Amino acid sequence: DGEWISFASELEKAGADALELNAFILPMDEFAESVEVENMYFDIVKHVKKVVKIPVIVKISHYFTNLPAFVSKLKAYGADAVTIFNRFYEPDIDIERIAVGAASVFSMPADLRTTLRWTGILSGKDKLLQLSSSTGVHNGEAVVKLLLAGATTVQVCSAMYEQGIGTIRTMNHFLNSWMDKKGFESIDEFRGRLSYADAGNAARYERAQFMKYFSDHK
């Protein structure tokens, strides 16, 4: 935890308004219980919060046994907000060179689905949760979807690398045009309207199997 604390303190002194901890611990120890892995995250948050006064956001992956419970505990340990999900280096295999290399570091639009599901569930279960949604956001439509699901804010990274910084202007234009078309004057008027709690059909978020889809598929 020492480096987390040191860097957090230095960043606050440098003038940061808030701090996002991009935390990912690869759980590879077959003898470690899941609670031991989760406690590593809680310890980081607890110790960082002791040395800074600015808001602390924790950026997490979806590799947890029970995400709602884990996020609830992060808040209990002092996290002011949570970002879902971080994207990290992943390996790939080159079958021509017969070697392990790196996969693409950029997200794809299809990655939005996991983020969308958990944005809806987490925001629906805790309406006071400050939730930033990330990964798979490549256009304005994705921004609108995440806000409808309950995101407090939306993060964009891969799209800017691939399309340039102007993509932010394009996304904002789409959002404003969509709001005008639907008659909304502020984001708060529709934020979370389709969350797990407010969608009127929570089963859509809970459903994970394809049986009904394929039985209806022509």
Say what each PLM segment does.
Residues 2-132, 138-154, 200-202, 206-217:
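Alpha/beta enzyme core
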Residues 137-139, 160-161:
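Short Gly/Pro-enriched loop/turn and capping motifs at secondary-structure junctions
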Residues 120, 144, 148, 165-176, ...:
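A generic structural signal for well-ordered alpha-helical surface patches
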Residues 177-217:
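Charged C-terminal helix
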Residues 1-3, 162-163:
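Acidic-and-aromatic substrate-binding clefts and catalytic sites of carbohydrate-active enzymes
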Residues 93-108, 161-184:
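C-terminal helical cap(s) of enzyme catalytic domains, especially alpha/beta-barrels
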